[in-house]
Amino acid sequence: MQVSSYLRRALRRPPFPAGDANHRRLSSAPAPKPEAPAEAMPPPPMPTRPWGEALAAAQRAFCLPLAGRVLAAAGTGNAAVSAPAVHVSLALAAGGARGATRRQVLQALGCGGGGRGGAADAANVASRVVKRVLRDRSTSGGPRLAFAGGVWADASRSLSPEFVGLAGNVYGSAAKKADFKNKPEDAPDQINSWVKDSTKGTVTTLLPAGTIDQNTGLVLGSALYFRGRWLDRDDLRRTTEQKFYCLDGTSVEVPFVEYDRTRLFAVHDNFKVIKLPYKQGKNERKFSMYIFLPDDHDGLFELTQKIFSEPMFLEQHLPTEKCHVGISVPNFKISFQIDVKDFLKDMGLELPFLREAEFSDMIKEDDSSGPLFLSDVLHKAVLEVDQKGIEETSVSMGLGKPLPAQHFKADHPFFFMIREEVSGTVIFMGHVLDPSSRT
């Protein structure tokens, strides 16, 4: 099968404009006789709504529910998920799907009724998120970002060159093959090696050993790494060892960064929220971390229940007023890896995982190797918040400096999100239960 016509036409670009003189000089062969005019093809569908509106719909319909399920199932460890990265991978899968399979994927992604316009919305959101939000521009002084996404089929399949081009050109991802049937034990190493190369070593594994077997169909994968420097890091007071109180009543000694600054800050019933902006590079993007800190040491899960059960809760409780705040935040690193297949099924995405799935636009028309379906949807999130990221600087407090009006000490479990402010894309959601854990 071929890539759907509306995507194929979007990819097709003639090497020269019709009648270009340079084109005529490249060949001495006589010009072919004009053919009878073909029936005019309808133009490819345009997105049904502006990308910002489509992105907001996707975050409400897909990203928030997925993040809620992942974090609720994370157990007693730190966890983070980049739902937009998973969204990009599934949008890529939709680009290679047909019929009911495509409709179901698009509906799960929050892209309308799953028709051609919905497919254009999904492609538009995914393409802009990858190219505008997740692309690394750390050389200009902004945060370090590394995204890798792709789909892998068995080596026996004949991938459509048009779909391979679609994956790279539109979704910033890859469509590749690995030998699932004959060398399933080697396939994870092959895929992990590609992820490591694509992220320049910031993400070293995506597939754990034993993930692949001889019956594996398609594997979708996405990984995102983030590390930034706080804005105004020269205002840093000090880094000290302090206690962090865990949910089980124990405590751990970890490094805390302490400083005071005027920041967007809000006090709500039973929790506080602070916005910590990252240093901006020489582009329009602006990243910030928002920390939601419950008043009670064991209040995190009650808070996250509200966050994920009310679609507008986060937006309605973001801080809007600035305040001079004494800030104390622990260093932490999260490296969290998970197969989100079961969460997607719980969200109604079932057909793509059945042998009846139709991903025929991923392969050539002469591929007769049998059913093509999703086996796994793997995701990994890696982010670092530590003294290296903020470039610790020794600064004296100074006499006569005003005391902060509020204090924000994140010394017990909290929820956080990292948002790109210009587009409104929430690239990470997560929670910290024990900052001494480095996985």
Curated annotation (Swiss-Prot):
Coiled coil segments of this chain: none
Pfam families xref list: Serpin (PF00079)
CDD domains documented for this protein: serpinP_plants
Entry's Gene Ontology cellular component terms: extracellular space
Sequence ranges of Pro residues compositional bias: 31-44
Domain of life: Eukaryota
Region of interest (Disordered), residue spans: 12-44
Residue numbers spanned by region RCL: 389-413
Annotated positions for site Reactive bond: 403-404
A GO term, aspect molecular function: serine-type endopeptidase inhibitor activity
Recorded family membership: Belongs to the serpin family.
Written domain comment of the UniProt record: The reactive center loop (RCL) extends out from the body of the protein and directs binding to the target protease. The protease cleaves the serpin at the reactive site within the RCL, establishing a covalent linkage between the carboxyl group of the serpin reactive site and the serine hydroxyl of the protease. The resulting inactive serpin-protease complex is highly stable.
PANTHER family recorded: NON-INHIBITORY SERPIN-Z9-RELATED (PTHR11461:SF189), SERINE PROTEASE INHIBITOR, SERPIN (PTHR11461)
Name the UniProt record assigns to this protein: Probable non-inhibitory serpin-Z9
Native source species: Oryza sativa subsp. japonica
Lineage summary: Eukaryota, Viridiplantae, Streptophyta, Embryophyta, Tracheophyta
